[in-house]
């Protein structure tokens, strides 16, 4: 069976709270690391989330 183009990734908060989201991304169309602003419920603000690998 062929391997898909999408990888599971973890978006971790840069606020240092330890909060994270999981999502998928197409590694062929977007090889660079993602940096997205999302809501962090621990600090109750929108902060940047950086892409990290799922362990």
From Swiss-Prot:
InterPro entries: Ribosomal_bL33, Ribosomal_bL33_sf, Ribosomal_zn-bd
Highest taxon of the lineage: Bacteria
Tagged with keyword Transit peptide: no
A GO cellular component entry from the record: cytosolic large ribosomal subunit
A GO biological process held by the record: translation
GO terms, molecular function: structural constituent of ribosome
Keywords: Ribonucleoprotein, Ribosomal protein
Pfam families in the record: Ribosomal_L33
Family: Belongs to the bacterial ribosomal protein bL33 family.
PANTHER family registered for this protein in UniProt: 54S RIBOSOMAL PROTEIN L39, MITOCHONDRIAL (PTHR15238), LARGE RIBOSOMAL SUBUNIT PROTEIN BL33M (PTHR15238:SF1)
NCBIfam families: PRK00595.1 (NF001860), rpmG_bact (TIGR01023)
The protein's name in its UniProt record: Large ribosomal subunit protein bL33
Biological source species: Paraburkholderia xenovorans (strain LB400)
């Amino acid at each position: 069976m062929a391997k898909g183009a999408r990888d599971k990734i973890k978006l971790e908060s840069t606020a240092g709270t330890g909060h994270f989201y999981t999502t998928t991304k197409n590694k062929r169309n977007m090889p660079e690391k993602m940096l997205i602003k999302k809501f962090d419920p621990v600090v109750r603000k929108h902060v940047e989330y950086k892409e990290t690998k799922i362990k």
